Amino acid sequence: MIEEEILKIIKPTEEDKKGIEKVLEIIRERLNKLDFEVEGSFRKGTWLRQDTDIDVFVFYPKDVGKEYLERNALNDIINRIKDLDYTLAYAEHPYVIVNINNVEVDIVPALRVESGDKAITAVDRTPFHTKYVTSHLDERGKDEVRLLKRFMKGIGVYGAELKVQGFSGYATELLIIYYGNFRKVLEEASKWKHPIKIELTKPMKIFSEPLIIPDPVDPKRNVTAAVSLKNIATFSIAAKYYLKNPSIEFFFPSKKVEEKVKGDVLILRLNLDEKSSEDIVWGQIKRSVNKIERALKQYGFRVIDVQAWGDTNNITIAVQLESKNIGQYYLNIGPQYYSETIEDFIQKNDNIWVGEDGRLYSIKERKEYDAETIAKKNIVLKVKYNIESYWLQNKEDQQIMKFLRKTPTWLK
């Protein structure tokens, strides 16, 4: 079966594990005498080959509070690894990313709590997630998780961060625990119709999201709260098509080089001057995308699509229009002659006439009819940035080709 072939590609070898252990030895030496644990997919045995981020959590008594993590704990960790290649990253609170032998190690300060439902910060639940998963998955189950993760990565729905709004690693593990194996997850997902409820434990509150998986270690939390309806739909359709015609294309989509430019495509390249939390930046980018689309439609442009991609510092926004050319003037349709609002319409407009249908009309001048200017004005980033903008002429990179193509390679 194709899944066995995929596993040969994505399952780590003993050599891979030894390499990770060497990196962990360096980290263990630096964090000596601290209360720390290795967490995440490496600890759970569900990690993918050549996709290794190690999570190391340093625990502090819950009584010290969140502010202690952000200052004292963070400084303590930095002092221990400052001679290594490291950067600061930001989520609910700051943490450290160390790069050793091309392996990224996230060192995250957290509070030691009694149970997952007593979590003070989001990361405090992590040890309980690890314990739950390792106690419910055997070796075959871990491979089934690997298949599901790679499938979701291939179709673009993996990652709970705001930029993606997809499935977290923990969500994939719970899906395998609930349904049993990769194929069974796809069989059920192919029949999904939201709202979808998957209950490994009874929920402790009412959830409103389209996909609901109450967290077994904290039933007040929906594990899949971040998953967008678009990604749920994409996963369901991909599952249906894979079951009909299994292909490596779902796991490792091919790169399409040529794609015709349809309509007019505006490219906005943003370079951010400051480092910030990825979720904060992408929250602002998503608002910008929505605002650009609304503004262009309000000014009379026919918008085909607006998308954004990139990382925390370099972001591309692509705006596809039926045409970038729009008239300086437009037909303004007014009320019927018998309407009580005709006097107001006449007062506010010039060049007014009565049409054959008994309705009043006027000619109005657009306040703005340059799409590039409108798009730039509606970027709502709160950090300083440089911008380069141009209308697409040539086929450029894979992301732009993907934007132009629209249809996933696994679908056609």
Swiss-Prot record:
Organism whose genome encodes this protein: Saccharolobus islandicus (strain Y.G.57.14 / Yellowstone #1) (Sulfolobus islandicus)
The family this protein is said to belong to: Belongs to the tRNA nucleotidyltransferase/poly(A) polymerase family. Archaeal CCA-adding enzyme subfamily.
InterPro entries for this protein: CAA_C, CCA-adding_arc, CCA_tRNA_nucleotrans_2, NT_2-5OAS_ClassI-CCAase, NT_sf, NuclTrfase_I-like_C, Polymerase_NTP_transf_dom, tRNA_NucTransf2
Miscellaneous notes: A single active site specifically recognizes both ATP and CTP and is responsible for their addition.
Protein name: CCA-adding enzyme
Cofactors (names): Mg(2+)
Binding site for ATP: S41, K44, H129, K149, Y158
CDD domains for the chain: NT_2-5OAS_ClassI-CCAase (cd05400)
Catalytic activity: a tRNA precursor + 2 CTP + ATP = a tRNA with a 3' CCA end + 3 diphosphate; a tRNA with a 3' CCA end + 2 CTP + ATP = a tRNA with a 3' CCACCA end + 3 diphosphate
Enzyme type, top EC level: transferase
Molecular-function annotations in GO: ATP binding; CCA tRNA nucleotidyltransferase activity; magnesium ion binding; tRNA binding
EC number: 2.7.7.72
